Amino acid sequence: MAAGKVKTGYSLPYVALYSATGTTVSYTSGQKLARGVEASYDVETSDDNNFYADSIEAENDSGTFKSGTLNLTVDGLKTAAEKLIMGLPTATEAGLIAYGDSQAIPDCGVGFIYRFMSDGVTSYTPMIFPRVKFSQISESGATQEDAIDWQTQELTAEIKRAEDTNRTWKYVGEEVSTEAAAEAVIKTFLGITSA
């Protein structure tokens, strides 16, 4: 029997607008973000606070989460998802969306699925970041040569603590046997009821 599990995939990123009233967190306008290509996150923690007595470390207050960065690589955002995470205004009559002073990037909740394998058995784990704020999106593109050069989009978001009583910055779901079951956990958390 394997002692651990190996990560074999990432899929189905979802996003929703975050709001909080007191310590009650809620989400609206949830939707599929794009098709997932790669996901990673880095966190910064405070230093451990050690107390010494009788010439030894007698007590320890472990470091806690301070901040983090979520990096998502996706195939490419559709207009609705880009407008949501970038806080963009309604398009002009000419169909143009203005990035400018009227833009207000909102806090969002983000969820996606990591796939694992252990002893030949596949499992799926939902990952949820209850409050993030996306950075302005940088883009690049290259002309097609002899073959298609598949070009992806990089998204970066600041990981923040939710305003719930626990000040949660991440949720990890139980392992489930199907991707659909993991997806259902994310959609329920983010208040997404449509298909």
Label each PLM-derived region with a short phrase.
Residues S46-S55:
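N-terminal "mature-chain" segments and other terminal, solvent-exposed stretches
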Residues A58-E82, D149-A162:
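Oligomerization/assembly interface segments of phage tail-like spikes and tubes
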Residues K78-D101:
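Charged, amphipathic alpha-helical segments
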